[in-house]
């Protein structure tokens, strides 16, 4: 009886472990349709646009930063987005994904110049 009770509790409270599914294409110029199961250490999906191509792959969420992604992909200009749902790295609205550090730096520089121009020393 105790064994049966333990088995029932195990099935009720333990969820099966499924690996994350992500699209997986390198420097694609078209919509990616190939998917893959991510390994346990890659817990998010990445979509990164660089130049005329788009990268789709499994990615470690803690490494979802401009520096890590640009180093790994050997790209100096890119926009990227990491997500944690199955097949979430689709090429919809890629123009709205995170801006790169260089875009933010240009905006900050422009703001500084406007402020300096309006408030002379």
From Swiss-Prot:
Sugar attachment sites: 24
Keywords for this protein: Disulfide bond, Glycoprotein, GPI-anchor, Host cell membrane, Host membrane, Lipoprotein, Membrane, Signal
Residues with lipid group (GPI-anchor amidated asparagine): 96
Propeptide feature ranges: 97-121
CDD domains in UniProt: TFP_LU_ECD_CD59
UniProt membrane topology term: Lipid-anchor; GPI-anchor
Keyword Signal: yes
Annotated Gene Ontology cellular component terms: host cell plasma membrane; plasma membrane; side of membrane
Protein name, UniProt field: Surface glycoprotein CD59 homolog
